[in-house]
Amino acid sequence: MNFELKNFNTIRINKNQTILIKTTNLENSSKEDTYQFILKMLKAGVHFGHKIKKWNPKMSPFIYQKLQGIHIIDIIQSYTYLKKACKLVYSKSLTDNYNTFLFVGTKKQSPIPNSIFYHASRCNSFYINNKWLSGMLTNWENTTRSINTLKYLKVYQKTNMFSKLSMKTHSIIDKKKNRLEKYFGGIQNMTSLPSTVILVGQHNEITASKECRKLGINNITILDTDCNPEFVDLFIPANDDSSSSLNLILGELQVAINIGRQKFCENLKTWKNSSSILKQI
């Protein structure tokens, strides 16, 4: 499918089909940069929603039109909300709490788990991409206990004492370690609650979303046309089923985190080499 941005009011998909888009909320920063980025979003399929019969009416403000039986997401709002989310994670990453981001997406038989793992790893963040266990955040003491057990078993398996155990005992320990690795491997180095959770696949992550709200943790969620925007602090209306759409959005968030951390390190170096009186306060 070839896209052409005729101007900031229409998108021509082919000779016979044109999608209209809103421009009222579009920032006047750099028209050319915005033009190119929106084109990039369109090529990634960010604007494709679900079939009309599967929609959630609460997503109505973010749906612009119907096309061939599916809802088309307002691409300008997708762009605007993605920009807001990137600004938030960038500002968060400027602090000295280095590992404060948790990526969550566990929907099986979808590109979500792989995208979550890839982009979390690229910005040295934590992730849960297998299953969200109830109380993962709200019962942090129990989660920490499981993480410590996982770490202990990993070390124990390398000792001479472990090598002397029977094969049956080896099997029991392996199964326990593998189970803990499955659920806690992506957060095994997380020593405290995250400041920001990035969620993909809202229907599968309702428990995670509720735990974030209960604890006052910032929650950024990619919302497709079948989702509910009332459950999250900040959301990005976008296609959450396509790997190209997910990789574009999560990739931008990942880059924003890395740039913020790089900026923090540069400022920290300048700060340490400074003789400013502010260091005495």
From Swiss-Prot:
Keywords: Chloroplast, Plastid, Ribonucleoprotein, Ribosomal protein. The keyword Membrane does not apply. GO terms for cellular component: chloroplast; mitochondrial small ribosomal subunit. GO terms for biological process: translation. Gene3D superfamilies: Glucose-6-phosphate isomerase like protein, domain 1, Helix hairpin bin. It is found in: Plastid, Chloroplast. Belongs to the universal ribosomal protein uS2 family. NCBIfam families: rpsB_bact. This is Small ribosomal subunit protein uS2c. The gene is rps2.
